[in-house]
């Protein structure tokens, strides 16, 4: 999982989710796209 200051979709199957005030990107097709903000 990458932690970066700005997160966004990197492909069509990425989903943006908010959990406990943090923004996550999860991707089933390409798990390398997992990101977290903050």
Swiss-Prot record:
A GO cellular component annotation in the UniProt record: ribosome
Domain of life: Bacteria
UniProt entry keywords in alphabetical sequence: Ribonucleoprotein, Ribosomal protein
Keyword Ribosomal protein: yes
GO molecular function: structural constituent of ribosome
PANTHER family xref list: RIBOSOMAL PROTEIN
Family classification: Belongs to the bacterial ribosomal protein bL36 family.
Name of the protein in its database record: Large ribosomal subunit protein bL36
Organism: Chloroherpeton thalassium (strain ATCC 35110 / GB-78)
High-level lineage: Bacteria, Pseudomonadati, Chlorobiota, Chlorobiia, Chlorobiales
